[in-house]
């Protein structure tokens, strides 16, 4: 299991991402990707479903788009401006989140506390598919979670995992991304003791040692807010933020009313 601790210190980090097809059962949707009819995003007991009645429902999270029977063959898409849009099979817009920001790469993440949150744009990227100073070969390590939120920490061989890719805060103080063609590392092995990795509230990843001395930083500081580091299925580690929209309705999904934002 990844070792995640909530710290009171602020920090941030951001990454860019390619637009691959989303797989059913994953916990995030990237800009340009589509959740088709009967598609799911899942995280623990929470399940976001683009239902065949055209209603987007977050089960156990008490939220819905209230668009039942408003279309057929509906699809959910995240735009390059961070807006979630449901479109009918004929291409007409059925619902939108109405939360638009600057053009960039965004991620809609099903948070472990049961909220759907849109983060972006991306501010930092680790690329294991190109050669360079930080390259290193792949080796097998056990899998765990793929998300790190602002204020959370990885330490003592804690890791994020996605398919055959793993981002590990090693005990030797080196941050290593295993996978891709070349892998990646922070080149900080032996530079401190009891090191931990933290994502702050300005989109920056920071490695600190036991004395809180900064060992490494992504140097991706942005504006204050909530960010998320996603280890994607394609092997890229990307930081998105700040959060620009989230589900907030507490009423039952059985209730019917106006569109939520």
Swiss-Prot record:
Motif Carbohydrate-binding motif 1 extends across 51-59
One GO BP annotation of this record: response to other organism
Which cysteine pairs are covalently linked by disulfides here?
54-74, 173-195
A single GO molecular function term of this UniProt record? D-mannose binding
Q: Where is the Bulb-type lectin domain?
A: 26-131, 145-252
Task: Please indicate if the UniProt record lists Repeat as a keyword.
Answer: yes
InterPro entries the record matches: Bulb-type_lectin_dom, Bulb-type_lectin_dom_sf
**Record-linked Gene3D superfamilies:** Bulb-type lectin domain
Q: Which CDD domains match?
A: B_lectin
Amino-acid positions noted as binding beta-D-mannose in the UniProt annotation, renumbered to this chain: 51-55, 59, 63-64, 170-174, 178, 182-185
- Name the SMART domains on file: B_lectin (SM00108)
* Superkingdom field: Eukaryota
Q: Give the motif span (Carbohydrate-binding motif 2).
A: 170-178
Which region is the signal sequence? 1-23
Question: Which UniProt keywords are present, listed alphabetically?
Answer: Disulfide bond, Hemagglutinin, Lectin, Mannose-binding, Repeat, Signal
Q: What is the role of this chain?
A: Mannose-specific lectin. Shows agglutinating activity towards erythrocytes from rabbit.
Assembly, per entry: Forms heterotetramer of 2 chains 1 and 2 chains 2 arranged as a dimer of chain 1 and chain 2 heterodimers.
This one is known as Mannose-specific lectin 2
Source organism: Colocasia esculenta
Name the lineage: Eukaryota, Viridiplantae, Streptophyta, Embryophyta, Tracheophyta
């Amino acid at each position: 299991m990844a070792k995640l601790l909530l710290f009171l210190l602020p920090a941030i980090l951001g990454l860019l991402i390619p637009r691959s097809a989303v797989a059913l059962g994953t916990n995030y949707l990237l800009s340009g990707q589509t959740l088709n009819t009967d598609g799911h995003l899942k995280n623990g007991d929470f399940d976001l479903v683009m239902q065949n009645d055209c209603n987007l429902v977050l089960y156990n999270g008490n939220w819905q788009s209230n668009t039942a029977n408003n279309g057929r063959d509906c699809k959910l898409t995240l735009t390059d401006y961070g807006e979630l849009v449901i479109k009918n099979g004929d291409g007409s817009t059925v619902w939108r989140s109405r939360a638009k920001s600057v053009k960039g790469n965004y991620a809609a993440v099903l948070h472990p506390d049961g909220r759907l949150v849109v983060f972006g744009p991306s501010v930092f990227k680790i690329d294991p598919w190109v050669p360079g100073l930080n390259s290193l070969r792949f080796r097998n390590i056990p899998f765990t979670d793929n998300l790190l939120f602002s204020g959370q920490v990885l330490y003592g061989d804690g890791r994020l995992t996605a398919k055959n890719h793993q981002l590990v805060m090693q005990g030797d103080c080196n941050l290593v991304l295993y996978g891709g063609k070349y892998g990646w590392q922070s080149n900080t092995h032996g530079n401190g003791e009891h090191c931990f990795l933290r994502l702050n509230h300005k989109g920056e990843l920071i490695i600190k040692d036991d004395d809180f001395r900064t060992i490494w930083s992504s140097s991706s500081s942005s504006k204050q807010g909530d960010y998320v580091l996603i280890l994607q299925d394609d092997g890229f580690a990307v930081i998105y933020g700040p959060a620009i929209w989230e589900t907030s309705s507490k009423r039952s999904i059985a209730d019917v009313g106006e569109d939520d934002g």
